[in-house]
């Protein structure tokens, strides 16, 4: 049994949950403490977190530390999201927090944050696996942005981020002095404008039957976790023009919750109009639940019921399709690459994560040709770095992007391509994976899949690849 504390420094509240994790009984929440403070308000207005807000956070975190000591937790993790991620004084803020609390704060990339939210939903295995059998969208509304993840036949096929989070929208309306009478109309225009391109790109040929709502107070406001489309629209019409005080009394939630709930309702309403959603599921889970699930996963305290790596690969394949990459060429290259990787894994010090990164690089290695045939490598690098590959850290995404880039041009030295995210170890990983991709790509240079069978034989320090074909290679 392990006691684990998860702390989420969000845009409009700081939350700590204490979990009891056992291999037999799974994850059990035993305490939850939440403090309302709007870090995002400072950031989205001024571009940085103020000293007063930082000092208040330090006081709250020190209280959390005392609670953790009282429970004698075995481990803990502190994560910050978009407010800290976008703060211009991020480094100064993190240093001040560490010096005053002793806590090391991990600033999550958007993709890592949303993937953890996704894991929190997947922890409800029975409900989750049943729901995603039909077309499903997860709409994760945060203070700074929203993430929409689409599932088709129980696999994640696309995930996209838009900077229309509830706190950001609220601050925008307040700065423009919008009255409650015109609030919905103007906010709807802003959100619908963002959804217009999204619908054309991702919803054109998809039927979305279910909507899963994450990271918001709507479940607390409606006092249920499942709603039909008509139930939601009735709730929306009843709430949208009420004053904050009146709405708070109606929903039995604090008044300051209403100010961020109202923009969220507009986002959900606009998504319902863009997709033919039948049912809405509000599991009431937060980032802290995902942190506990990931901790249990990494420490092998739980048996996983969902293959998250396959979700990442499915999303990569969908992106490759969008950039008109050759599916048959990818299949041949991926099979060859995995065969080579498995043979040299031990001698090269690879791990399972490296295998996943190689497969993603193989799947996406042709995407740059969509932009430029003469400069495909550089184009592919920028495409991949701009992608929201949910489940990959920025560091891992940069590895994939560089492997694809240097598949077509000579690999430069570490002093030329090194960055703040790229360690020497990452550079060596790029070099090794690039070599594998270069070999397998050359074996199907014609894109005609002439190879019928391939065998890899490792003899001491030499890898021999035997190919069988009825045609000239």
Predicted regions and their residues:
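Gly/Thr-rich phosphate-binding beta-strand-loop-beta motif of the actin/hexokinase/Hsp70
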Residues: 1-28, 125, 130-158, 214-216
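Helical "lid/coupling" subdomains associated with nucleotide-phosphate turnover
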Residues: 4, 42-66, 70, 83-87, ...
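Post-signal peptide N-terminal segment of secreted/secretory-pathway proteins
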Residues: 74-76
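Metal-dependent catalytic neighborhoods of phosphoester/phosphodiester hydrolases
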Residues: 87-95
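A short interface-forming secondary-structure element
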Residues: 465-473
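Short coil-to-beta-strand
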Residues: 27-37, 157-164, 308
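Conserved ATP-binding subdomain of kinase catalytic cores across diverse folds
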Residues: 23-38, 43, 69-70
């Amino acid at each position: 049994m392990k006691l684990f504390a998860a702390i989420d420094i969000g845009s409009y509240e700081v939350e700590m949950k204490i979990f009891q994790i056992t291999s037999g009984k799974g994850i059990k929440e035993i305490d939850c403490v939440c403090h309302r403070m709007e870090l995002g308000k400072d950031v989205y207005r001024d571009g940085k977190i103020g000293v007063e807000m930082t000092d208040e956070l330090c006081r709250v975190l020190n209280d959390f530390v005392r609670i953790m000591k009282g429970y004698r937790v075995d481990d803990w993790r502190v994560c910050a999201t978009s407010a800290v991620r976008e703060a211009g004084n991020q480094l100064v803020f993190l240093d001040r927090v560490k010096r005053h609390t002793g806590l090391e704060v991990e600033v999550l990339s958007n993709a890592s944050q949303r993937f953890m939210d996704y894991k929190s939903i997947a922890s409800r295995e029975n409900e989750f696996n049943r729901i995603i059998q039909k077309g499903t969208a997860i709409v994760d509304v945060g203070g700074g942005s929203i993430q929409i993840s689409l599932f088709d036949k129980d696999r994640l096929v696309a995930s996209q981020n838009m900077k229309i989070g509830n706190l950001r929208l609220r601050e925008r309306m307040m700065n423009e002095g919008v009255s409650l009478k015109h609030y919905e109309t103007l906010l709807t225009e802003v959100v619908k404008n963002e959804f217009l391109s999204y619908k054309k790109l991702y919803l054109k040929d998809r039927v979305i039957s279910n909507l899963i709502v994450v990271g918001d107070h709507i479940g607390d406001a409606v006092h249920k976790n499942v709603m039909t489309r008509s139930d939601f629209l009735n709730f929306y019409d009843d709430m949208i023009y009420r004053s904050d005080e009146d709405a708070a009394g109606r929903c039995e939630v604090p008044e300051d919750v209403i100010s961020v709930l109202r923009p969220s309702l507009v986002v959900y309403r606009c998504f319902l109009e863009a997709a033919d959603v039948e049912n809405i599921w509000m599991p009431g889970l937060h980032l802290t639940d995902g942190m506990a699930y990931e901790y249990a996963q990494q420490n092998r305290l739980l048996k996983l019921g969902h293959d998250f790596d396959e979700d990442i690969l499915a999303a990569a394949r969908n992106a490759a399709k969008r950039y008109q990459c050759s599916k048959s060429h990818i299949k041949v290259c991926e099979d060859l690459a995995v065969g080579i990787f498995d043979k040299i894994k031990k001698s090269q010090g690879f791990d399972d994560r490296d295998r996943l990164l190689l497969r993603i690089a193989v799947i996406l290695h042709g995407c740059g040709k969509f932009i430029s045939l003469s400069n495909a490598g550089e184009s592919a690098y920028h495409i991949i770095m701009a992608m929201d590959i949910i489940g990959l850290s920025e560091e891992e995404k940069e590895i994939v992007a560089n492997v694809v880039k240097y598949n077509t041009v000579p690999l430069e030295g570490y002093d030329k391509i090194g960055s703040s995210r790229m360690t020497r170890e990452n550079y060596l990983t790029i070099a090794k994976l690039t070599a594998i991709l270069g070999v397998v790509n050359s074996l199907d240079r014609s894109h005609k899949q002439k190879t019928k069978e391939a065998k890899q034989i490792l003899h001491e320090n030499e890898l021999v690849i035997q190919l069988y074909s009825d045609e000239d290679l």
